[in-house]
Amino acid sequence: MEQAKDFFDESKDLHELLNAEGVGCLSTATMFKNWTIEDVIGHLYLFNYGAVETLKGGDHFDNFWKPINDQVLDGKSLVEAQVPWLNGVTGNQLLDDWWQSVEDVFNAYKDADPKKRVKGGGPEMSARSKITARHMETWAHGQEVFDALGRDREEKDRIKNLVHMGVIAYGWTFVNRKLAIPEPTPYLILNAPSGEVWQWNDKESSSKIEGTAVEFAQVVTQVRNFADTKLSITGEPAIEWMKYAQCFAGPPEDPPAKGTRYKVGN
């Protein structure tokens, strides 16, 4: 699957940044729930491992997930719940283990049946959706790492995977919050990193979002408040969408408050 290569390349960009910065950067706090970069890498490693386990079928995913989920149900945060699983692995060893998990995910998914149903923390999904979700999470958590280190990421057109996730989650964003789905669905016209123009939905819609694909992806993955972007947002449906946008599964999560997520040094 092409999405497996996109996931690998996204992970590679993050890996190269961390190698350039050195292991000392792992103690740096990010603007995401005050997680350190080491927390972020542990989180990505954990869920990469889970992605490989779920593709094996049977009880593999359940055996991996139950001890972690039990801790979350007992009130622990995901970062706290991952500590026993990581079993004391930190620093360079964590970086090595995370990178090995990236290669394992890529090798498992590159030739997998895209339509195979796999388990996750929520409803079952296709293998294609699972690897796309791994790409999304790597990019989104990578954003807080690049931000914390004051570095710019060279964006690529593979971000289209994330934009598409955001687009198809339009209705679910509101249903998940027990809100009515506003009509009409907004028309999107977004500039890709390559300069291509991407469009979604009916161009005759009275509600519209224009801008860069990167900023749209930042909003739907909740790494930026829409008010901190240059997106042009027209019509009530588009405004409401950008207020609540959430392309990832799980209970409703509130986007970051205005001005709380940015690149250090800006």
Q: What is each model feature region?
A:
Residues 178-220:
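Glycine/small-residue-rich hydrophobic helix-like segments
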Residues 4-7, 95-98, 131-134:
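Hydrophobic packing residues in well-ordered alpha-helices of helical domains and bundles
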Residues 26-71, 120-176, 216:
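Short, contiguous alpha-helical
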